[in-house]
Amino acid sequence: ADTWIFITPCYVNAIPGDAVEVLAKLHQAELSRNKYVYAIAQGGMPYTHTHHCCIGNIELFAKAMQLRWMGGLVIGGGAIIDGVTLKRLPNAVPVEHCLQKLIACTQHKTKVDSLLSKQAEMKIPGFVARLMCLKMNHTIHKQQKKIKADRHICFYAKEEKHARKG
C-alpha cells in the first residue's frame, strides 16, 4: 500500500506504548520511502488541542523515515476506538463530516487542512465547562476523603518520604 493511515487512541500527552512499538518496528523495517502518511488520534477530552501531541508524534515518525506527512485528524469527546458507533458520540455530525474530508484527502493524496480537527471539536460553552470542572473536582475531593488522603499533600511525595525512612 502506498498510503498508511495510523489510527490510535490518545492520552493527554502521549500515544499508547503499543502504538509507539508499531512505529518503531516500521522504522526498523526501513520500508519504501514513497508512502503517504495520515493519522487519526482519538481521545476522551472534548478539546482537540489536548491531543495534538499524538498527531505530532506520528508526524515526527513520518519525517524521520522520510515519508510524506499529509496531516491528521484529532477526535475528542468520547470513545470511538472501543467499537461504539459514530452516531453515539456527542459530536457525531461534525466528526462524521471531518472523517469524510480526511477520506477524500487520502483518496486524492492531498494534505489534510490543519483546521480540520477544530471543525470536529465539541462546542462547549464556558459556563458548562466550568460546571464540569467543579463537578470533577468535587468527585475527586470526595474520593480523597473516602480514602483519608490529604488533598494538600502530594500522595507521591508522602510515599517518597516513607521510602527514605525505611
What spans do the regions from the language model cover?
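Helix-loop-strand module that forms the ligand-binding subsite of alpha/beta enzymes
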Residues: 1-66
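Residue-identity detector for threonine
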Residues: 3, 8, 48-50, 85, ...
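Weak global preference for isoleucine
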Residues: 5-7, 15, 40, 55-58, ...
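Contiguous hydrophobic segments
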Residues: 33-36, 40-43, 66-86, 130-144
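Active-site/pore-lining binding-face segments in mid-to-C-terminal subdomains
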Residues: 54-115
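C-terminal and late-domain segments of enzyme folds
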Residues: 90-166
